[in-house]
Amino acid sequence: MKNIAKVTALALGIALASGYASAEEKIAFINAGYIFQHHPDRQAVADKLDAEFKPVAEKLAASKKEVDDKIAAARKKVEAKVAALEKDAPRLRQADIQKRQQEINKLGAAEDAELQKLMQEQDKKVQEFQAQNEKRQAEERGKLLDSIQTATNNLAKAKGYTYVLDANSIVFAVEGKDITEEVLKSIPASEKAQEKK
């Protein structure tokens, strides 16, 4: 009796496995990088982000130039004091020379402290700008990738594909159809992208 149960279970397992293996699977490939690069909304998104961040970037560039100009002016100021001291040194007493050197050192230290503060503020603004820019780019990139995923899913369901794989992650495949262009064509363009065409 045990043998009959084993043979029946084995036969049933083989029948199920062969039936599953013989089911036709349709496999398709897409080049996700190509689709992303040629997405109908990609340029509109890039233009939108550029318009959003260009004024801030220009303001930061102007602020950096202002800081650089202040650094140059501070150096010139200290260098002028040093040059004046060198010129006057032969006529001055040693105590007067030391006093003026201390004044120059104090002036240099005060200028350095002020400039360090300005540079730190500038660096903080730049870091905040970069973080905000990266966040917005990630948000917009996510929207584009979502639309690619939706278009791929819809096309795969409509055409009856069992699997859709990224062609860049496949080492070898015996069969499959490249549906990259079909997916790209099925992505609806936003109104802004259509206006640019």
Curated annotation (Swiss-Prot):
Signal sequence coordinates: 1-23
Major subcellular site: membrane
Keywords on record: Cell outer membrane, Membrane, Signal
Translocase keyword on record: no
SMART domains: OmpH
GO biological process: chaperone-mediated protein folding; protein stabilization
GO molecular function: unfolded protein binding
Effect of residue 170 to V: In strain: NTHI 289, UC1 and UC2
Cellular localisation: Cell outer membrane
Pfam families: OmpH (PF03938)
Keyword Chloroplast part of the UniProt annotation: no
A cellular component annotation (GO) from this entry: cell outer membrane
Family: Belongs to the Skp family.
Protein's recorded name: Outer membrane protein 26
Organism: Haemophilus influenzae (strain ATCC 51907 / DSM 11121 / KW20 / Rd)
